């Protein structure tokens, strides 16, 4: 499918870089003029490695396969313009927005409402999902064949598909259409009104907990169905150690499965929670052992990609503490910085592995092309403090507020057009 995007760009200057590809280092230049950016004086851009100078690093543009842009239907939380500007500021040249919208993109007519706004307002490439079920209500499958040429994959993100037979039918159709099923795995019968992980913090503070089985039980079911149907299957926002074990074993057995986790599950556990809405999301931040399992998967190659699950809400909706706030935090503008600081600088994974997780693997799995004009430039040497008041997103709720991090995005180019330039970098 083709990406949807408007055409925007700002003037910039030239930047000398030293390119680090698979076959060594060579001099090069990023030329930015009249809203266009391109790499020159070097061979074709190699997306399998970072490009570096003594001052700046140039990477292939990131792809976030799990974002909530909220428009149409909930533009008081986020708009396609504000969300894609936030994406560009975080180094993304493409995003895949989830279908929990109003109207839900469960038909071509409803999808067109979304894509018309994307064509008008988006500053990065946008690859929308189509819904698995009509209205994401779980009662009847959407017309997947009608939607397939126009969407990147199918998902009912925001809730799990509760019926085993319905998920089987969805996988059979998606397999025939050569499309992925992208699953929010959550058994609603096991939620028990919980608001955070069913662990030490919940017990100490008298809060209802969400058990890990609510996630891994549905992953277990779906992996069986994926093996039976041969459907390509991708699991969203994995948070617990049991899920990691299931996914590792399924890969070894030949199931066509990939999975993502989010920065907050890699960098936080429930010992760090506060009674603040910026720590509430679904699935919840879990225990130290779960985080350790995710870190091991990131290091040993089991983890396929990192996606933010960027889910903005209004300030009022996030002001009610852990028990009363809505699920969801923002992450597009700070994901790379938090991960580079917490995982690369600490030696958990290499910089190349982080780029694989954020840029290369998402493109491969979701068939999103990497053009020479899709790149992002970062300063990795100078720290800055995460300040939600500076966000381009309408959302301000992040557990990383106040963190000192390394990795500031200076420029993002999308198909040669400048989608983001840092004020300190413009000249």
Where are these regions (language model features)?
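N-terminal metal-binding scaffold of metallo-dependent hydrolase/deaminase domains
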Residues: 1-47
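Active-site mouth loops of central-metabolism enzymes
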Residues: 65-78, 101, 127-139, 158, ...
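Divalent metal-coordination and catalytic microenvironments
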Residues: 17, 35, 55, 66, ...
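Metal-associated gating/positioning segment near the N- to mid-region
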Residues: 56-121
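Active-site metal-binding motif and surrounding structural segment of the metallo-beta-lactamase
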Residues: 44-58
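His/Asp/Glu-enriched, well-ordered alpha-helical/loop segment
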Residues: 204-232, 299-300, 304-306, 311-378
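Histidine/acidic residue-rich metal-binding segments in metalloenzymes
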Residues: 11, 141-306
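C-terminal cap of metal-dependent C-N hydrolases
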Residues: 321, 372-427
């Amino acid at each position: 499918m083709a990406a949807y995007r408007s055409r925007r760009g700002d003037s910039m200057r030239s930047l000398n870089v030293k390119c680090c590809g698979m076959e060594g280092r060579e001099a090069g230049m990023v030329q930015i003029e009249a809203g266009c950016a391109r790499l020159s004086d070097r061979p074709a851009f190699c997306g399998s490695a970072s490009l570096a100078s003594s001052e700046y690093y140039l990477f292939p543009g990131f792809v976030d396969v799990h974002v909530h842009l909220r428009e149409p239907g909930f533009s008081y939380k986020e708009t396609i313009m504000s969300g894609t500007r936030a994406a560009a500021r975080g180094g993304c040249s493409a995003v895949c927005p989830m279908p929990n919208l109003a109207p839900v993109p469960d038909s071509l007519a409803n999808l067109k409402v979304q894509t018309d706004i994307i064509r008008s307002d988006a500053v990065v490439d946008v690859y929308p999902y189509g819904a698995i079920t009509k209205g994401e209500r779980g009662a009847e499958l959407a017309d997947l064949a009608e939607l397939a040429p126009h969407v990147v994959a199918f998902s009912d993100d925001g809730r799990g598909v509760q019926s085993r037979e319905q998920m089987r039918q969805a996988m059979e159709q998606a397999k025939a259409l050569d499309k992925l099923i992208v699953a929010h795995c959550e058994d609603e019968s096991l939620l028990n009104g919980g608001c955070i992980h069913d662990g030490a913090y919940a017990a100490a503070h008298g809060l209802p907990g969400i058990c890990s089985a609510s996630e891994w039980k549905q992953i277990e079911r779906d992996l069986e169905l994926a093996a039976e149907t041969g459907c390509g299957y991708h699991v969203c926002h994995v948070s617990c150690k049991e899920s990691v074990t299931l996914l590792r074993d399924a890969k070894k057995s030949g199931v066509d499965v990939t999975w993502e986790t989010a920065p907050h599950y890699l960098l936080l556990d429930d010992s760090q929670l506060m009674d603040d809405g910026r720590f509430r999301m679904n699935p919840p931040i879990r225990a130290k052992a779960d985080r350790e399992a995710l870190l091991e998967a990131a290091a040993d190659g089991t983890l396929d990609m990192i996606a933010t699950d960027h889910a903005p809400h209004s300030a009022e909706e996030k002001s009610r503490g852990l028990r009363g706030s809505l699920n969801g935090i923002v992450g597009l503008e700070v994901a790379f910085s938090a991960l580079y600081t917490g995982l690369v600088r600490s030696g958990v994974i290499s910089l190349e592995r982080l780029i694989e997780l954020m840029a290369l693997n998402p493109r491969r799995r979701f068939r999103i092309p990497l053009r020479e004009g899709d790149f992002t430039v970062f300063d990795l040497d100078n720290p800055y403090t995460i300040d939600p008041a500076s966000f381009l997103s309408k959302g301000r709720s992040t557990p990383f507020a106040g963190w000192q991090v390394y990795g500031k995005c200076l420029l993002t180019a999308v198909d040669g057009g400048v989608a983001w330039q840092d004020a300190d970098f413009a000249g």
